[in-house]
């Protein structure tokens, strides 16, 4: 089968993780869910086209795709990968501290296009006929931050109502030094999960190369041994901090041994000391947690190293952390929407415009508590300030087709002013039409049309038609136009604006329904 072409947002992410963050092709491939060959191919194409990173701001996704891929040529033949001398590998494994990981790294340094680690191990096991080896856990300074939630919860009592609510304990642990952070949140949902990460990064004062999480639902949409599907909002947060999410493999406890061990320590260190205390707010609980975490990090000595976690952090992790961005990450979520024929998308009962030529298109919407961004094919086509969920419309004038834009000149004040100029009955009619509609904006066009009837029928007849319309509750443009065309405005009419109810045998009284 032909190789599936990468999306341009994936291409940009590959370039960022490789050229900014400095991750290996293998880690980038796992992080983005693409083949390692695709990562290498993307970097080769970038070099071939003479492009530099960061890419120019003026280059769009469409132009980048044309530059990198252009017109497909002949498919290059696949070079046969060189196979190691397995007997030599077996001899080296008998030496102290030598693992398959070490030997594979030496092999891949000699042959960068050689087998990936998993395939390398598989071929060796096939040759030797032995069981899989366990990879030794070793964490370089500033390389990994492990995150998870503790299993046990802490009760928080509402002082006014007495209602008890459970708080969840988020834990983050540095890979090399075991410096620990904990925070109580109301849930393990994505917004709380993201905010806990923001707090953790502020606590550590820097960012690691990798972010290792358990396969919690708010982080990983679909757990997989080889290619987990990471939540897009979580990936966006990692991109903001110039790190990469690296989920632990399912049913592989050694992948998350550091954080699992620390969770146990935190549960014993924190929860045991908090068991007899009553907390009346999340802030009170987090203050108590912060005090105990400070004691754990700064006072308790790790016997095998003879140093505290804080001392190890200052020595191993801190010098290798990347700086924090200027602003913390603002949680954003993604949703697919279809643009309506009125060139608006609906999000939480509020409507946002896009350029009218994109009507009926399927788009992606990225939204925070403050902003709404709309994307089509990776390009942003509209951006708005987040509106309240009240069924209203947020419309940008340039998004409207030309025949709609002229209505933008008619503000509510101008509509009422023009109606008052024609006569008091028309002013009342305009107010009634606007009040009747669920959304006032829906009545503006009808009012503009009614006011425009002055040119055809004159001021006096339009004012008379407005009075008759009010008598018979005709509150729409077609009804007013019909009154004028049929000259009903010339007929004698009651001086009263309200008609007596019609009485006949087909009308049922209120008692009918009781």
UniProtKB/Swiss-Prot annotation:
InterPro entries: HTH_IS408/IS1162_type, Integrase_cat-core, IstA-like_C, RNaseH-like_sf, RNaseH_sf. Keywords: DNA recombination, DNA-binding, Plasmid, Transposable element, Transposition. It comes from the Bacteria. Residues 11-93 form the HTH IS408-type domain. Pfam families: Mu-transpos_C_2 (PF22483). One of its GO terms (molecular function) is DNA binding. Residues 128-317 form the Integrase catalytic domain. This is Putative transposase y4uI. PROSITE patterns: HTH_IS408, INTEGRASE. GO terms for biological process: DNA integration; DNA recombination; transposition. Belongs to the transposase IS21/IS408/IS1162 family.
């Amino acid at each position: 089968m032909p190789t599936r072409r990468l999306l341009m947002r994936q291409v940009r992410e590959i370039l960022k993780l490789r050229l900014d963050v400095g991750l290996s092709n293998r880690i980038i491939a796992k992080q983005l869910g693409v083949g390692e060959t695709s990562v290498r191919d993307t970097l080769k194409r970038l070099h071939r086209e003479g492009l530099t990173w960061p890419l120019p701001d003026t280059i769009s996704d469409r132009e980048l795709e044309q530059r990198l891929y252009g017109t497909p040529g002949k498919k290059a033949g696949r070079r046969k990968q060189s196979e190691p001398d397995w007997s030599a590998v077996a001899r080296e494994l008998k030496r102290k501290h030598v693992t398959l990981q070490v030997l594979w790294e030496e092999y891949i340094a000699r042959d960068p296009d050689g087998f990936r680690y998993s395939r390398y191990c598989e071929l060796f096991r096939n040759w030797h006929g032995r069981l899989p080896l366990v990879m030794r856990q070793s964490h370089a300074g500033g390389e990994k931050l492990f995150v998870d939630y503790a299993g046990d919860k802490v009760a928080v009592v509402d002082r006014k109502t007495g209602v008890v609510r459970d708080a969840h304990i988020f834990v983050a642990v540095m890979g090399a030094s075991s410096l620990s952070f904990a925070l109580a949140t109301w849930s393990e949902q994505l917004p709380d999960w993201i905010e806990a990460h923001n707090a953790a990064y502020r606590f550590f004062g820097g960012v690691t190369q990798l972010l290792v999480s358990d396969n919690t639902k708010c982080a990983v949409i679909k757990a997989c041994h080889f290619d987990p599907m990471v939540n897009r909002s979580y990936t966006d947060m990692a991109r903001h901090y110039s790190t990469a999410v690296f989920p632990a493999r399912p049913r592989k406890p050694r992948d998350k041994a550091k954080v699992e061990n620390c969770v146990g320590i935190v549960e014993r260190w924190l929860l045991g000391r908090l068991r007899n205390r009553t907390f009346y707010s999340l802030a009170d609980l987090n203050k108590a947690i912060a005090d105990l975490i400070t004691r754990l990090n700064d006072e308790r000595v790790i016997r095998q190293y003879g140093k505290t976690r804080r001392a190890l952090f200052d020595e191993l992790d801190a010098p290798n952390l990347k700086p924090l961005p200027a602003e913390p990450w603002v949680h954003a979520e993604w949703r697919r929407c279809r643009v309506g024929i009125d060139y608006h998308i609906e999000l939480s009962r509020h409507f946002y415009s896009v350029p009218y030529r994109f009507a009926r298109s399927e788009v992606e919407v990225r939204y925070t508590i403050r902003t709404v961004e709309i994307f089509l094919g990776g390009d942003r086509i509209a951006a708005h300030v987040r509106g309240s969920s009240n069924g209203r419309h947020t419309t940008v004038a340039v998004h409207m087709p030309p025949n709609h834009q002229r209505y933008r000149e008619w503000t509510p004040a101008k509509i009422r002013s023009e109606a008052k100029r024609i006569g008091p009955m028309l002013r009342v009619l305009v107010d009634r039409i606007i009040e009747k509609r669920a959304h006032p904006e829906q009545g503006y066009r009808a009012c503009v049309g009614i006011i425009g009837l002055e040119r055809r029928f004159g001021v006096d007849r339009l004012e008379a038609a407005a009075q008759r319309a009010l008598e018979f509750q005709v509150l729409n443009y077609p009804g007013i136009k019909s009154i004028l065309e049929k000259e009903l405005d010339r007929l004698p009419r009651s001086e009263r604006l309200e008609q007596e109810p019609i009485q006949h045998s087909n009308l049922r009284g209120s008692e009918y329904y009781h």
